[in-house]
Structures are given as C-alpha cells and as structure tokens.
Amino acid sequence: IGTGGIAAELLGDTQTLILPVEPRDVLAAINRLQLAPLFSGYRGTPQGDLDAAVAAIMAMAAAMQNDAALDEIEVNPLMVAGQGKGAIAADAVIWMNDNQGD
C-alpha cells in the first residue's frame, strides 16, 4: 500500500502487508503512510472514504488468497473519494501464473 505514481518510489511512502490480513491491519497501514493526513481533511479537503479504501484492498486480498492463478495485482491509483463516496481503481494490472491449484 502506498502513495500512488512515482511518489511511492521517490518518497518510499509504502507499507507492506503479508496475507492474510484483517481490515484493521489495512487501516493501520494506511494511517502509517506519509500521505495519511490527506485522508483526514487536511487543509479543508474532504475527509477520505477510508472504509471504501479498506474494502477495496480487502477484496484484492481475498482474490489473491482464493485464486491460485493470480500472481500479483497492482492498482495505481486507487482514488479515494470523500467520506461515503467510495473509492475507484483508476488503473489496474493483474499478473497470472500457470499454477492452477496443483
């Protein structure tokens, strides 16, 4: 989990979670990011819909745990809207492997 785009690499603003995870783990990782204050209504901006962000990340985690053919999922960016307005994956790449659960 991290700041989107090249900022993730430039700033090193990332958090790594090992599956399985619980929603509280995802939320804690988000809150450890340098960009976390932006989700709290920084300088008058709307508070971010962290529930939706956590739900999106949990859905990706569930997919990874339940489908042996999935190798990696990258969403960049996951755009987090204002409180109660959701989150949307603007772009995603999914890498598949040859493992069919053997």
Language-model segments: residues:
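ATP-dependent carboxylate/acyl-activation modules
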Residues: 1-102
